[in-house]
């Protein structure tokens, strides 16, 4: 799964996330019939006390959705994906420091709590 997410993030990072006034990136997750789907959106606003900021979509890169077949339960998937995304973001910070350096980054299920990872 990590390689699949790494490849997806590499493709997404080719869009100009850093040039759009985006202050926060949200990796959303929802369940599908065969597993889960990840997507990325960006917002020009962020509020640490109100997760509704993630609903303010000011940026959606092309190739935004990644379907992942999985038999994990939602908690296990969330924990695994959160760690993988954090690792991938840290790796991309080395190769493209401007990409995520000034961004809030969070992961969450569409109808659940959001976890800030950066």
Model-derived regions: residue spans:
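Acidic, proline/glycine-rich low-complexity IDRs
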Residues: 3-18, 46-51, 57, 63-68, ...
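Amphipathic, interaction-prone secondary-structure segments
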Residues: 14-50
